[in-house]
Amino acid sequence: MDTVKSINKGYGKVDETQDLALKRKTRKRLYQIGISVAVLVAIIISSTVTIAIHSRKGNSPHPTPSSVPELTPAASLKTVCSVTNYPVSCFSSISKLPLSNTTDPEVIFRLSLQVVIDELNSIVELPKKLAEETDDEGLKSALSVCEHLLDLAIDRVNETVSAMEVVDGKKILNAATIDDLLTWLSAAVTYHGTCLDALDEISHTNSAIPLKLKSGMVNSTEFTSNSLAIVAKILSTISDFGIPIHGRRLLNSSPHATPISVPKLTPAASLRNVCSVTRYPASCVSSISKLPSSNTTDPEALFRLSLQVVINELNSIAGLPKKLAEETDDERLKSSLSVCGDVFNDAIDIVNDTISTMEEVGDGKKILKSSTIDEIQTWLSAAVTDHDTCLDALDELSQNKTEYANSPISLKLKSAMVNSRKFTSNSLAIIAKFPIHERHGVQSPRLRKSPHPTPSSVLRTVCNVTNYPASCISSISKLPLSKTTTDPKVLFRLSLQVTFDELNSIVGLPKKLAEETNDEGLKSALSVCADVFDLAVDSVNDTISSLDEVISGGKKNLNSSTIGDLITWLSSAVTDIGTCGDTLDEDNYNSPIPQKLKSAMVNSTEFTSNSLAIVAQVLKKPSKSRIPVQGRRLLNSNSFPNWVRPGVRRLLQAKNLTPHVTVAADGSGDVRTVNEAVWRVPKKGKTMFVIYVKAGTYVENVLMKKDKWNVFIYGDGRDKTIISGSTNMVDGVRTFNTSTFATEGKGFMMKDMGIINTAGPEKHQAVAFRSDSDRSVYYRCSFDGYQDTLYTHSNRQYYRNCDVTGTVDFIFGAGTVVFQGCSIRPRQPLPNQFNTITAEGTQEANQNTGISIHQCTISPNGNVTATTYLGRPWKLFSKTVIMQSVIGSFVNPAGWIAWNSTYDPPPRTIFYREYKNSGPGSDLSKRVKWAGYKPISSDDEAARFTVKYFLRGDDNWIPKAVMGMPPL
């Protein structure tokens, strides 16, 4: 029997290459999301910051001798470098430059950028050279990734240099540009890390080449990190030096500012000057110089010519994907080529839109309007992204199957795309960096911040917080209202419309595809996809309805309670879509159908993620305090969530109830089976429908569908009223559908019931209970099985005084879940297996999901000799907290284990915490040393994961009057 590490859980746990791809993609966005939020906050509070800065200027326009430390240049450099992770390399690299004889922190920062640029330029060709030394195609592919990423890193650092404003020939930082600099340098740091990730993927090779490149990258990694650290601390550093930001005159700070003199240049020199701001200056000069009208010194005319170059090149390759598709019968490759054809056409439309926005003037020439610069940058950025999307589609094939890595068709298309991507990048760099407005006496918008944000700039800022900004911008911008609004709430509503429309367009696809196959396993997987798409549509629809109530009511802001709901429902939709992909990955089907469905899901996946990011990062207001002061009281509280209304709470506590339906196997009730009772439940009921199930064992599989709302089912005791099933993965049923009992409708409650899956450990995945019910409660129930016993799939769930038994990942899912006063009991698994209690499945940083185990007991169910862990991270943002619980000695001292030892330790994006646990297994001295694991340090921090806080995810929802329950 395989060890637990090799058991297929599906659900994102099978394909290691996909897992690595997800990690690379997510890491690439982590800094951008965080910094984009900072940009939004800066927009909101910009007026306050401006007042504060100028007040400081008014109070002290020039630093007094007493306010400026008497530092030598060396001491100044040492002070600035002290904020970095690599102060020694920071000091030694900058001190070698001639201009380092300065005490000005801003000049030191500029010198640090020069160090980075020089170092990156010295290694940018290294991956290509090293690739010539090997025949290992996997290694060549990794080196190609590094070459591309180092290219991008140079772009980002160049943008950082260009963004620093010009004053009397000098460059100077201001507060408004610092967020941009942080974003670009963060991206450059990420690109280094992604290159290293790519090299680590091919660690099986015996070649010394990866080590050569890693060694070659040490300096650039450190220098880029140094620049990022310096700019992140620049304001406080300048303050420490006693230099007011506006003490030195900035552009437009004085009506007497000396204009920058622009030397008269020849056409050739002008072209070189314009192209110098691009990443590919040689291709920029050579391509534009071939055009007849390139004999000009006008930067704006040269920009127009760069666009013409892009259009010509794109038109020359637009039909190539279709032609290449005729040369292959491989459906997956055809699908990727279709993606490339679509994005090429989109890029052509974008560049044509760019040209169209240039205003006609009297002599037939075109001139850029400053008001359109933001739009042009957005469009050209999207055109660059279109190229990358094609490359991603081709690279995804090679990640899954090595035969695609050197496919002649893929290589043909990649080679043909080289120029169009370079030319598009050149046009973007020119409009973003070169002051092309000075000829017309119009100040460059790069140097002038409009006090009134435009619809396009707000859309771009909002979309920058998402994982897929290009698809966010392109999808929302197609809606008419996006052209006129600067309200983030309205843009969020438009994003929901985009998501809803896209989900509706694919919701029937699994059923259609099922008609194209006779493979019963694949049909079963497609059936799961149909079900979860349905659930996702409902979740998005709930989100829209709730938001529309706020908008129609004329409220300007969403309250924290509503935002908590919206994040929960969209988190659920993200999970639902991911579950379809996971289910398709549970088996290796000899069919193009899974890839067809995955390709069709791309937009819905991205759009749902975008909507979640917007509400979580833009609309959710930061808390005024870390946590209400009553942190300790919350930890000691054993009350139910506040959405368990007093009347419902009385139902849970009552001893004598009058049910709507009574189930009795002996015929003494209204019906004999639980399913018969479920059929009697009204659809979308507003009041609680009560089902009583008398003592007995009911062998049946029960599904409480999504339209069965507010159902309360109770029995005579967890050991007396039992629902039993044996559906399992080995017998051909997908994990999602193996549950003995599943509930999807909101407001579900269960009391004094036992749910069992008797399939046994040999049958692997065999779920006893699955919950997708939002605001559901389980009181004095038991869930008994082996692998995957309790599937807390999605939405808010509360388990109180319940028993859960199992072996492998026996509490798993991506709901927002609290276990309180429960008995969690691992049992003996198969030989060579180990136990893992939890496998939490949060996919994205913005999901408010996770598992909190509070005031529980973790003890063995019988004689357990197998190694037992508290859990392992299933997904990239896995979140699990165990606090104030009793942990038995049978738990391994390490506490936690990585999903696959190949990736040990897990990424720092996971969130694993413990707090004030007791028992022999609670000793933290030998716990894992992961970046994503650490003990909680205070009651206030721990209170975030209590019932009152975690199940709503916001500081402000805790009621004044706590609803008490009997002591645990």
Swiss-Prot record:
Per UniProt, substrate binds at 735, 765, 872, 874
The feature of type site (Transition state stabilizer) is located at 787
Name a single GO biological process.
pectin catabolic process
Q: Where is this region: Pectinesterase inhibitor 26 C?
A: 453-614
Organs and tissues of expression: Expressed in flowers.
Record-stated family? In the N-terminal section; belongs to the PMEI family.
Q: What is the protein's given name?
A: Putative pectinesterase/pectinesterase inhibitor 26
What species does this protein belong to? Answer: Arabidopsis thaliana (Mouse-ear cress)
**Which gene is annotated as encoding this protein in its UniProt record?**
PME26
